[in-house]
Amino acid sequence: MNDAYPQLKALGERNHHMASKATSDVLERFVRYCEVPSQSDPRTATAVPSAPAQVDMARVVASDLRDLGAKNVTLDEHAYVTAHWPASAGAEKCPTLAFCCHLDTAWQTYGSPVHPQVKRYEGGRMVLGCGRDGAEVALDPASNPELKDLVGEDLVTTDGTSLLGGDDKAAVAMVVSLLARLAENPSIPHPALALAFVPDEEIGHGAALLDLDALGAAYGYTIDAGPLGEFCYETFNAAEAVIRANGRSVHTGTAKNVMVNASEALLRVHQLIPAEDRPEFTQDREGFFYLERIEGDCEDARADYIIRDHDRTRFEARKALLRSAVAQVNAEYALRPSARDGQPVLSIDISDQYRNMAEVIARPENAHLIESARRAYAACGVTMRAVPMRGGTDGAQLSFRGLPCPNLSACYHNAHGVTEFVPVRELETMVDVLQALVGIYAEGYQVER
């Protein structure tokens, strides 16, 4: 192990049925990637990348790919890293298979500096450290029941002061470690591979600038799902809504029949949205409205919502409900003595972000993507669990652009928070799964397109 990571030295040897030096290297790579800050920033979402730190992460990955001998390694001005890996002997005519991971980490909590720890979980409550507010941060089976199945295992955790970045740096480490394995043993069966490491997934960019013609893949997989065995070919339909309020500010002592409080108007809209349709009250295939941010004062205010639903009809109904709520509040304010000469207090702008990729992946011609993943997991002793993803991946947009991409496990738990962790066994097993998967596609899986 790299001497820069002394916390990794005492982990000992791990023997899996496909184990190799390249497999054990996945842990070192993951820790190293986590230590490179790369949060995206919704405040500058019109720029790609939205934050310069993502370029640093892109440079690290591009350098690792070149060191392994990947072909056509490119790092462009938008922090997209792409590369190719040639097919093994005899698999040259198989369609090119893509793997796509994202370089950025979530922006909702602290993302720098990141201090990964490798800790043996012995059961019960495991203290990670203290948060930035001084409060103790711990993993607890009361909130993470899966810990009961991880007793005696090594976990990569935070120190309580930031997220970890397993979403999606665990996936980046897995893919690079797969290539290390193929470089070490070129006879491992695999088709030609196209690799894409992209920015700004966490703010809904959706790999929009990825050149699919240059990538040259017939189909592929994103690696951005949760615990080992998770497989997603359903995502939410997603939209974002921005509601702006224009009020009239006057001295509170003379406000009667004159003042129009922009912030109060936004609160009235929020009251009209069913309370049970918020993220904290929904699960599985239940959609929601999420008030992501609200800011402003009496004169001007703004509320940002995201709208999510797996069902297309319900999704459209949710957008209509929000528009109706805005119209109702405008009508209510128009009847007040303080009405602004017929000018509405509120305006709303709704933009679709991505669609449920099941519309593409569930087509008969793409069914092999589901079955091949199931076979690859099974070859490594893992039962695949197809779950509707309560979120989205770059694969959602890529699928509708002509590159069908369901989603494999990245093996992170508690994403986007200071209790995020990744079990080392899951991390290493997924390298085995990826090897099994490329082997399946090296069998000459021909698809009519």
Model-identified regions with their sequence ranges:
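Glycine/charged-rich beta-loop-alpha catalytic/anionic-binding loops adjacent to active sites
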Residues: 147-162, 246-250, 380, 412-416
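Active-site metal-coordination/substrate-binding segment of hydrolases
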Residues: 91-192, 197
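N-terminal capping segment at the start of a domain
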Residues: 23-51, 156-157, 249, 356, ...
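A non-catalytic alpha/beta surface segment that caps or lines the substrate-entry region
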Residues: 45-94, 98-100, 104
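Short, conserved charged micro-motifs
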Residues: 92-93, 253, 312-317
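Acidic/histidine-rich catalytic neighborhood of metal-dependent amide-processing enzymes
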Residues: 147-236, 278-292, 296, 303-310, ...
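Acidic-glycine-rich active-site phosphate/pyrophosphate-binding loop
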Residues: 134-154, 232-244, 374-375, 406
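Metal-dependent amide/peptide-bond hydrolase catalytic core
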Residues: 8, 263-449
